[in-house]
Curated annotation (Swiss-Prot):
Organism, scientific name: Escherichia coli (strain ATCC 8739 / DSM 1576 / NBRC 3972 / NCIMB 8545 / WDCM 00012 / Crooks)
Role, per record: Involved in mRNA degradation. Catalyzes the phosphorolysis of single-stranded polyribonucleotides processively in the 3'- to 5'-direction.
Superkingdom of origin: Bacteria
Subunit structure: Component of the RNA degradosome, which is a multiprotein complex involved in RNA processing and mRNA degradation.
Annotated keywords: Cytoplasm, Magnesium, Metal-binding, Nucleotidyltransferase, RNA-binding, Transferase
InterPro entries: ExoRNase_PH_dom1, ExoRNase_PH_dom2, ExoRNase_PH_dom2_sf, KH_dom, KH_dom_type_1, KH_dom_type_1_sf, NA-bd_OB-fold, PNPase
HAMAP family, per the entry: PNPase
Localization in the cell: Cytoplasm
A cellular component annotation (GO) from this entry: cytosol
Protein's recorded name: Polyribonucleotide nucleotidyltransferase
PROSITE patterns named among the record's database cross-references: KH_TYPE_1 (PS50084), S1 (PS50126)
């Protein structure tokens, strides 16, 4: 008999159910977590033995959404799920980041977490459910894991924090923040915000951490009922004698090497010291493990840098704790792009471009929660040459997708609304040099490139990466961290925003004991750094350019009667196709009658507008128009009177005397004055040449609304 063990509890406005013991019993642990009809099945498998020579912790997190969860069949050619989407990759990273630091140092057994979304309520995002599931499964598994963790989404609506807001509530929220942590400490924050203050952001982190304690308590209760015995794993005993010997050979030399401010020169010197030290030790005892020696040397490096920072000495590159590296800001660096910028901060550099397109260029995302259209695209590329290495170049890796998403979050809050600026915008950041915080350099470069492209962003934004070194009660917060300070520190803390507030905040904390006060110091120090960078950026460009690039499509907007949309589109799209070919423009029509005409040439746009106005103009009964004969039949002739509208001149209305043969009076293509006698309920038009000739002057084309240019 299958006997499920179930825990059910209230979490904010939702009911959460944890269930184990009924499915995937050959996995190390498996949990089905549901939150109001959104259900995620999470499994964990851990290998009891580490692979020989394994020198890093091989943790893999896979997050996969099944379309059956939403009652749909995949739209792909093969009608089955393919490789992970960008959204799935981002959620896999979201699960990975808070659990990774909770495995003990020295644990290198392979662990795989697989989270599968099996049911989805469109109002409840599965990411928090998956994070809770991963925490529960790891806690049940017996694998050495210092959890459990809780996870919460925090919104900010009407000046109130909201726990786990629904998708509808998120649309009204000024904040979308995910926080994860243990009972004692926050471990990870990922957020985007509409320029909130430092205090509001910190309040959200603290609120989310307090609220998620109920999750941790319930996972602990589930473990008491259904947990597997804890693995009898012990770290390798520390070889104190070997540590001392390595330190005697290398510590002083590494300390000197870390006074070299140039990254490449420093790395070269550190490599020499390491290889010479390892060679000396292997000559003394060839049974020594080279990997173990490498780990000891890395620990010495870490200690050298950390102790120097804590003692108040200058950092690796000679800076004080709150100093920003030298900045170089240039805009308009590429002649044919719509907007471009080169942003350099020390040895980190980003070449960023902005490209404007029409609504047709927007990305349609067929997601589990429903289809949505994205009109702001942000792509981040990290080629191997940026760190002086060779390597594969191809589709973006998980890290590039994650960094691109963070940079996008940093800029999103200042992007103009589509009704004010009806363009799809794509920003691409090419990292040309990297030594710390290339994602935040991408935010700065994006802000500059967008202004260079004439995109009316609400404010300039900049980003900065902060670090932390902490031993006991002694701690130092570092501004604008280098790559080495990121690896060797206890916290990586990225903040983007304008002068008025924060647009994105990302935190990854590797230790417990980071208090609210420490986070407050880091946020305030980050604000000072952000304002300094914005000041330098404003010297290069302090407002969006007054006009878009001559190479960008100009979008002109006119309004037509929604009833006339069918006339502009035509049967099977024939009219709109002919219009785009005739005028050389791109034409998009919305359901409310908004027509957007995109063209790089103003004259072409005017021509397209004129043609659309002709097609949509109302035909006035009693008015005389100049028309062209398009068809001749026995009972009369059809005459086009502009805008693709055609009316019938009956044989009795051709002349004021009896007409025996229509062709005696009219020829194909002949221009004739016609008077509109009637437009019937079906839109058919009756015309008269006889009555028109009695009136002296034909009327001009009907008036239509003037175009507005969407700049």
């Amino acid at each position: 008999m299958l006997n499920p063990i179930v825990r059910k509890f209230q979490y904010g406005q939702h009911t959460v159910t944890l269930e184990t013991g009924i499915m995937a019993r050959q996995a190390t642990a498996a949990v089905m977590v549901s939150m109001d009809d959104t259900a995620v099945f999470v499994t964990v498998v851990g290998q009891k033995k580490a692979k020989p020579g394994q020198d890093f912790f091989p943790l893999t997190v896979n997050y996969q959404e099944r379309t059956y969860a939403a009652g749909r069949i995949p739209g792909s050619f093969f009608r089955r799920e393919g490789r992970p989407s960008e959204g799935e990759t981002l959620i896999a990273r979201l699960i990975d980041r808070p659990i990774r630091p909770l495995f003990p140092e020295g644990f290198v057994n392979e662990v795989q977490v697989i989270a599968t979304v099996v049911s989805v309520n469109p109002q409840v995002n599965p990411d928090i459910v998956a994070m809770i599931g991963a925490s529960a499964a790891l806690s049940l598994s017996g694998i050495p894991f210092n959890g459990p963790i809780g996870a919460a989404r925090v919104g900010y609506i009407n000046d109130q924090y909201v726990l786990n807001p629904t998708q509808d509530e998120l649309k009204e929220s000024k904040l979308d923040l995910v926080v994860a942590g243990t009972e004692a400490a926050v471990l990870m924050v990922e957020s985007e915000a509409e320029l909130l203050s430092e205090d509001q952001m910190l309040g959200a982190v603290v609120f989310g951490h307090e609220q998620q304690q109920v999750v941790i308590q319930n996972i602990n209760e589930l473990v008491k009922e259904a947990g597997k015995p804890r693995w009898d794993w012990q770290p390798e005993p520390v070889n104190e004698a070997l540590n001392a010997r390595v330190a005697a050979l290398a510590e002083a030399r590494l300390s000197d090497a870390y006074r070299i401010t140039d990254k490449q020169e420093r790395y070269a010197q550190v490599d020499v010291i390491k290889s010479e030290t390892i060679a000396t030790l292997l000559a003394e005892d060839e049974t020594l493990d080279e990997n173990e020696l490498g780990e000891i040397l890395h620990a010495i490096e870490k200690n050298v840098v950390r102790s120097r920072v804590l003692a108040g000495e200058p950092r690796i590159d000679g800076r004080e704790k709150d100093m920003i590296r030298g900045l170089d800001v240039r805009t308009g660096v590429l002649p044919r792009t719509h907007g471009s910028a080169l942003f350099t901060r020390g040895e980190t550099q980003a070449l960023v471009t902005a490209t404007l397109g029409t609504a047709r260029d927007a990305q349609v995302l067929d997601e589990l929660m429903g289809e949505r259209t994205d009109t702001f695209l942000f792509h981040y590329n990290f080629p191997p040459y940026s760190v002086g290495e060779t390597g594969m170049v191809g589709s973006p890796k998980r890290r590039e997708i994650g960094h691109g998403r963070l940079a996008k979050r940093g800029v999103l809050a200042v992007m103009p609304d589509m009704d004010k600026f009806p363009y799809t915008v794509r920003v691409v950041s090419e990292i040309t040099e990297s030594n710390g915080s290339s994602s935040m350099a991408s935010v700065c470069g994006a802000s500059l490139a967008l202004m260079d492209a004439g995109v009316p962003i609400k404010a300039a934004v900049a980003g900065i990466a902060m670090g932390l070194v902490k031993e006991g009660d002694n701690y130092v917060v570092l501004s604008d961290i280098l790559g080495d300070e990121d690896h060797l520190g206890d916290m990586d803390f990225k903040v983007a925003g304008s002068r008025d507030g924060i647009s994105a905040l990302q935190m990854d904390i590797k230790i417990e004991g980071i208090t609210k006060e420490i986070m407050q110091v880091a946020l305030n120090q980050a604000k000072g750094a952000r304002l300094h960078i914005l000041g330098v950026m404003e010297q290069a460009i302090n407002a969006p350019r007054g006009d878009i690039s001559e190479f960008a499509p100009r979008i002109h907007t006119i309004k037509i009667n929604p009833d006339k949309i069918k006339d502009v589109i035509g049967k099977g799209g024939s009219v709109i196709r002919a219009l785009t070919e005739e005028t050389g423009t791109t034409i998009e029509i919305e359901d409310d009658g908004t027509v957007k005409i995109a063209a790089t040439d103003g004259e072409k746009a005017k021509h397209a507008i004129r043609r659309i106005e002709e097609i949509t103009a109302e035909i006035e009964v009693g008015r005389v128009y100049t028309g062209k004969v398009t068809r001749i039949v026995d009972f009369g002739a059809f005459v086009a009177i502009g805008g693709g509208k055609e009316g019938l001149v009956h044989i009795s209305q051709i002349a004021d005397k009896r007409v025996e043969k229509v062709t005696d009076y009219l020829q194909m293509g002949q221009e004739v004055p016609v008077k509109v006698l009637e437009v019937d309920r079906q839109g058919r038009i009756r015309l008269s040449i006889k009555e028109a000739t009695e009136q002296s002057q034909p009327a001009a084309a009907p008036e239509a609304p003037a175009a507005e240019q969407g700049e």
